């Protein structure tokens, strides 16, 4: 009998979609599928840590924030990852002052997503 590793779904609209960020945090590239987070819009915030800015090649973070416009949605990618990869993502995102919440995506599935703390 083979045991499979339990997995969770993680929706990313920002830096966790980048190959170099995935390699640095998970040790491999993730495979995902496109989806969207309805009822949210993207805002940006400056990156304070120069090491993080260098890693991702950007000066600002994307932040998904609830929107009053029902037409708004944030596009991104949903990844199936392990619990240990989720813990690594938590560590990476907490450094950027994000918190993880459970949401329903446009496809109808539930996934974790990081939003501004």
Task: Please describe what each predicted stretch is.
Residues 2-117:
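Glycine-aromatic micro-motifs
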């Amino acid at each position: 009998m083979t045991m499979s590793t339990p997995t969770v779904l993680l929706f990313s609209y920002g830096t966790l979609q980048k190959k170099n960020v995935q390699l640095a945090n998970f040790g491999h590239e993730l495979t995902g599928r496109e989806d969207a987070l309805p009822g949210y819009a993207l805002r940006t915030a400056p990156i304070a840590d120069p090491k993080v800015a260098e890693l991702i090649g950007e000066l600002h973070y994307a932040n998904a924030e609830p929107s009053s416009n029902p037409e708004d949605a944030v596009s991104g990618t949903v990844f199936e990852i392990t619990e240990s990869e989720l813990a690594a993502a938590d560590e990476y995102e907490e450094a950027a002052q994000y918190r993880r919440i459970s949401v329903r995506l446009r496809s109808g599935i539930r996934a974790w997503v990081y939003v501004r703390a």
